[in-house]
Amino acid sequence: AAAAVPRRGPRGGPGRSYTADAGYAPATPAAAGAAAGKATTEEQKLIEDINVGFKAAVAAAASVPAADKFKTFEAAFTSSSKAAAAKAPGLVPKLDAAYSVAYKAAVGATPEAKFDSFVASLTEALRVIAGALEVHAVKPVTEEPGMAKIPAGELQIIDKIDAAFKVAATAAATAPADDKFTVFEAAFNKAIKESTGGAYDTYKCIPSLEAAVKQAYAATVAAAPQVKYAVFEAALTKAITAMSEVQKVSQPATGAATVAAGAATTAAGAASGAATVAAGGYKV
């Protein structure tokens, strides 16, 4: 059976609650989306297609009256997500959840502010999906060129960190919003320590991992628990990806810590400026 298209908010669509408000001047249209060039899995390719559709939907909504913004955005964006639903059913619940979180989080004193808030929230929710697919799609490091330069133990720990992240993210996904941090932290610590045994503290990249976790936690300033966790997961995803890249070129552990922490800060900082980012799509 064909996969269901992700829900678009309560019956009648989000436009219903906004169209009753006074009109407002259209925002500046977003720049036309361009496909990014480094997708490596089918899901990543679909995410990039959705990114192009997302940018196009924002641009289309920017050029219509207030009463038509949500309807226009929804029509344009649904066509992109429908293609993803048909080709990768596993993306459906993720897109559905992203849209639901964005719809519930939309606030603003004016119709324009409400719509911008919705797009900003959806931007960050989609960023988490894209970031998770990126880190989960990193090739086993042993398949990358130049891996002979890195000690086998250091190569293995990268895979173990990535595996622990997946386990923890999966556990947190089913936990109540208020418990996501606790569940993630407990599952991540348990998985990484079990997989490395007594050698946990001997790996050079452990300091960078700890720095990344601290940066990611420190960056979660959003009020809503589900948004806090989404920002944290995106930040840690980027940090682990950065650590993997640093290890691949065999840089010192101090360099890995700097890159990983910087990636976490950058990812979280994107949330505070989400309204600006939204105009250009959610791809990093």
Swiss-Prot record:
SUPFAM superfamilies: Group V grass pollen allergen. Keywords: Allergen, Disulfide bond, Signal. The keyword Signal applies. Pfam families: Pollen_allerg_2 (PF01620). It comes from the Eukaryota. CDD domains: Allergen_V_VI. Residues 1-21 are annotated as: Disordered. Residues 1-19 form the signal peptide. InterPro entries: Poa_pIX/Phl_pVI, Pollen_allergen/Os. GO terms for molecular function: RNA nuclease activity. Has ribonuclease activity. May be involved in host-pathogen interactions. Belongs to the Poa p IX/Phl p VI allergen family. Homodimer; disulfide-linked. This is Pollen allergen Phl p 5b. It comes from Phleum pratense (Common timothy). The lineage of its organism: Eukaryota, Viridiplantae, Streptophyta, Embryophyta, Tracheophyta.
